[in-house]
Amino acid sequence: MSTNLCPNASSSDIQPILYSYWRSSCSWRVRIAMNLKEIPYDIKPISLIKSGGEQHCNEYREVNPMEQVPALQIDGHTLIESVAIMHYLEETRPQRPLLPQDVHKRAKVREIVEIICSGIQPLQNLIVLIHVGEEKKKEWAQHWITRGFRAVEKALSTSAGKYCVGDEISMADCCLVPQVFNARRFHVDLRPYPIILRIDRELESNPAFRAAHPSNQPDCPPELPNK
């Protein structure tokens, strides 16, 4: 995809580049946040599968030493880690805020984000599942997603309105929807989590969320059902 780079352009004139993998929930969070804030960006696909994983090549290691996605080149800087990226976007592009003004609601958003991004997703991430092994990876992922979703559902029982925290979309929603997708991939029984399911259904038709969906990414395999 075009990056619109111009040698005479200032860093603020260069369109951001998001290094992304179509099914990466971490990349997905950032895509949602950028779409919600209406920030134009180009995607540079990084396959986590092809040739043993393009994230491990020397060229990409210079972009992200953690050899993971996402990475975002923006304002003359390269940022890694999805939550750090979302906070940067929130601080530099305050339009369509993803954190509430109320300090208690803001803390609740961060709580839900941490449960998902620290307590669930890293434990069912590709790099972990490779070490767990093919025979046990489904059971492993189900265990950690179920454990984490119990905590998320409990948090939502006191914080949710239309969305995770009240009636405005927040970073918590940006993180929840991709994690529900992961749960379905690993055939987690989601019936015990009615609030999670309701919020996921509410957001599935939102244009920013729909555009960020894996099936709408340039590197999504053409044979994927419902692409």
From Swiss-Prot:
Cofactors named for this entry: glutathione
This protein's record includes keyword Isomerase: yes
Cited InterPro entries: Glutathione-S-Trfase_C-like, Glutathione-S-Trfase_C_sf, Glutathione_S-Trfase, Glutathione_S-Trfase_N, GST_Zeta, GST_Zeta_C, GST_Zeta_N, Thioredoxin-like_sf
Pfam families: GST_C_2 (PF13410), GST_N_2 (PF13409)
UniProt keyword Isomerase, yes or no: yes
PROSITE patterns: GST_CTER (PS50405), GST_NTER (PS50404)
A molecular function GO annotation: glutathione transferase activity
Superkingdom of source: Eukaryota
Summary of the function given for this chain in its UniProt record: Catalyzes the glutathione dependent oxygenation of dichloroacetic acid to glyoxylic acid in vitro. Has no glutathione thioltransferase activity with 4-hydroxynonenal (4-HNE), adrenochrome, phenethyl isothiocyanate (PEITC), 5-hydroperoxyeicosatetraenoic acid ((5S)-HpETE), prostaglandin A2 (PGA2) or 2-hydroxyethyldisulfide (HED).
Family of this protein: Belongs to the GST superfamily. Zeta family.
Name of this chain's protein: Probable maleylacetoacetate isomerase 2
Record organism: Drosophila melanogaster (Fruit fly)
